[in-house]
């Protein structure tokens, strides 16, 4: 499957499509409302763009929210240097196709010290190259609001986070200090130095995301679809073996099989699943009978030291 961006619309228009399912239309309306509320309430918003399926849906909704104008804020990609190569190629195609303003930020300390998932382990690597890098990028841009693609159905700590997630001047999150959100009324008042992470996809499920992708013909990184690919088995995960930087451990061997990814992150820390789902319809059918979370494929979520809530308290996405 090609990495090229394919859509039925031109780069500055949204093509006519059949009416959305009422459930998806309600979710779309809510997300567009959140985008417009944040853009109206805050001085300098930014959209976090991780290149995955949720980010792709988020970007599509942002384009709709401000159509026919350009998106009135930049995209921020926290670039660890360890994303799948297909993700970076896809990102560059999307930015060019849609005429987007993209900030790609890498933690200079991490780059100088050559911090890698292999040399520093998943928890320390994530803290330096993702959490610390995100805080630095938000400070450098003086952003007072950041859109993210997190959903409540993904993971326990995200389930209790509000749509407007308030952060301290050092970007920390206190789950005990959240504001009530009545219907679609959001309180965006912040003190000097504070900021908000806004999550327009909070009420979406993984299946909602995929059904919306199908309905709106949203392009994705091909890794989400099953294909014959090389991989190794490590720590109960299937790690893609297409990057020359992959360090094989004693006894490991490269295997081949039909695999795909439910979630995408840094390639050494993201596990694939065995799958024959090579089309959107196949993926949706597969998900409708799935019994485990998509984040089971993320090594960074597996131990207490790297738990999602701990990372979020420290400023993670």
Curated annotation (Swiss-Prot):
Record's catalysed reaction(s): sulfate + ATP + H(+) = adenosine 5'-phosphosulfate + diphosphate
Record Gene3D superfamilies: HUPs
EC number of this enzyme: 2.7.7.4
Molecular-function annotations in GO: ATP binding; sulfate adenylyltransferase (ATP) activity
Start-end of Basic and acidic residues biased regions: 1-10
GO biological process assignments: hydrogen sulfide biosynthetic process; sulfate assimilation
UniProt keyword annotation of ATP-binding present: yes
Superkingdom, taxonomy of origin: Bacteria
Pathway given in the UniProt record: Sulfur metabolism; hydrogen sulfide biosynthesis; sulfite from sulfate: step 1/3
Keywords noted in UniProt: ATP-binding, Nucleotide-binding, Nucleotidyltransferase, Transferase
Spans annotated as Disordered: 1-21, 298-317
UniProt KW Ubl conjugation keyword: no
HAMAP family (alphabetical): Sulf_adenylyltr_sub2
Role played: With CysN forms the ATP sulfurylase (ATPS) that catalyzes the adenylation of sulfate producing adenosine 5'-phosphosulfate (APS) and diphosphate, the first enzymatic step in sulfur assimilation pathway. APS synthesis involves the formation of a high-energy phosphoric-sulfuric acid anhydride bond driven by GTP hydrolysis by CysN coupled to ATP hydrolysis by CysD.
Summary of subunit composition and partner proteins: Heterodimer composed of CysD, the smaller subunit, and CysN.
NCBIfam families assigned to the protein according to its UniProt record, in alphabetical order: CysD (TIGR02039), PRK05253.1 (NF003587), PRK12563.1 (NF009214)
Stated name of the protein: Sulfate adenylyltransferase subunit 2
């Amino acid at each position: 499957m090609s990495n090229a961006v394919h859509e039925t619309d031109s780069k500055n228009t949204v093509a006519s499509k059949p009416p959305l399912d009422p459930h998806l239309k309600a979710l779309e309306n809510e997300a567009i409302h959140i985008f417009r509320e944040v853009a109206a309430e805050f001085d300098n918003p930014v959209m976090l763009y991780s290149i995955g399926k949720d980010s792709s849906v988020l970007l599509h909704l942002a384009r709709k929210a401000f159509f026919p104008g350009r998106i009135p804020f930049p995209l921020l990609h926290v670039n660890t240097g360890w994303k799948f190569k297909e993700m970076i190629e896809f990102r560059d195609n999307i930015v060019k196709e849609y005429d987007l303003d993209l900030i790609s930020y890498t933690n200079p300390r991490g780059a100088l010290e050559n911090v890698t998932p292999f040399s520093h382990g998943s928890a320390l690597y994530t803290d330096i190259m993702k959490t610390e890098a995100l805080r630095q990028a938000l400070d450098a841009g003086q952003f007072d609001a950041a859109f993210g693609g997190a959903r409540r159905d993904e993971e326990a700590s995200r389930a209790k986070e509000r749509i407007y997630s308030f952060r301290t001047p050092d970007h920390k999150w206190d789950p005990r200090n959240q504001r009530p959100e009545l219907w679609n009324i959001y309180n965006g008042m912040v003190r000097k130095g504070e900021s908000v992470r806004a999550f327009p996809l909070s009420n979406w499920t993984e299946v909602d995301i995929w059904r919306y992708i199908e309905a709106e013909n949203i392009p994705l990184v091909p890794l989400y679809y099953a294909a014959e690919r090389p991989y190794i088995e490590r720590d109960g995960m299937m790690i893609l073996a297409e990057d020359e930087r992959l360090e094989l451990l004693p006894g490991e061997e490269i295997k081949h099989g039909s695999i795909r990814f439910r979630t995408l992150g840094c390639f050494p820390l993201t596990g694939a699943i065995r799958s024959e789902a090579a089309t959107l319809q196949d993926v949706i059918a597969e998900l409708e009978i799935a019994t485990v979370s998509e984040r089971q494929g993320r090594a960074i979520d597996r131990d207490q030291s790297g738990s999602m809530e701990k990372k979020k308290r420290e400023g993670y996405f």
